[in-house]
Structure formats: C-alpha cells, structure tokens
Amino acid sequence: LDVYSKVKGKIPFFNRKIESWYQNASEFKMYNLDDLANLEHTENFTEKSLSHIFEGDLNKKGRAGGYHYDMIEGTSGSIIEGTKSPALNDAGIYEAKVEVNGIPKKANGGKSTFFPDHMSPQEIVDAINEAYSNMELIEGSRYSGTSQNGIDIEIILNSEGKIITAYPQKIE
C-alpha cells in the first residue's frame, strides 16, 4: 500500500505541485532576461515599457502592473497559481491573475492578458510594432491595432507617441 492511498481521495500536496508544474510547463522555449536585452526594433517603445510588458513592475505608489508574457525566467512578475484561463481565442491569448515581487495586481481585477506562449519575445515586439503601424484611437492615449498574425493589441502611448504598454485584447 503506498503512502498516498491513505489521503482520502485527495491529491497529495506533493502530487498537486507536480501536476501544477506540468500544466504550466509547455513544449515552448523558455527565455531569460539576457534575451530581453537583445531585442531589436524597439524604437517605438519607452525605456521602461519592455520591462513592464515582459517582467511586470511596480509603479511609484508600489502597485503591481504589466506582465503580459509568461515565458521568461527570472522576472519579478508571476502568474498566481490556479488563475490561468484556457485560451480565450484561436491566437492563444489567455488571462491570469498576476503578482509582481509578491504584490498582487489590483487593476483590471488583478488580471493581465498574455501573449501566446508559443511566441518569442522578439515576435511579440514585432507584433506590437505591426499593431502600432495600423492602430486607431480608442480614447485619450489608448489605441488598438492588429498584428499580422491577427492578434488585436491595445497600446497606450505617452505624449511623445512612444509605447508605454501594449497587451493582447480578449477579442475572439
């Protein structure tokens, strides 16, 4: 009789952790912070926007924000376990509750939308640039554009027209 059969039908904590790891692990390549340092075609982005998008950050008030890609190791942002949604559309966009440096995001119900795991950081920068090239004003400094692979991306610009943040929209 194994040890786990005595747990009254519950998945033991150890097995839950492994099961969770398998759900989050994918067949897609993981990247690291060095890969972010080597991104090309970033002229349309502010200095801080790429870390906001790819790593998550804390604003001046200490509030968590950003984090729209989960395939880079060593970032300050992370998905809160058990909150990752199934794909919201054919492109592979999903959403999840996030935290940055252990501080849960509060804006947007604590959720971020995520670029598909199968895309590389460079492919995401390129997709944002494609959306930037055909974006239309939503209101204020918020715009919406579409990448060549069909991802609708919301873009927020600063007063100089540089990208502060960009994230996939949940549109089907």
Regions found by a protein language model. Name each.
Residues 1-23:
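Hydrophobic, gly/ala-rich membrane-insertion helices/peptides used by toxins and envelope proteins
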Residues 5, 58, 171:
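Hydrophobic/aromatic-lined pockets within catalytic cores
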Residues 15-145:
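N-terminal "domain-start" segment
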Residues 130-172:
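Active-site or metal-binding loop neighborhoods of secreted/extracellular toxin and effector enzymes
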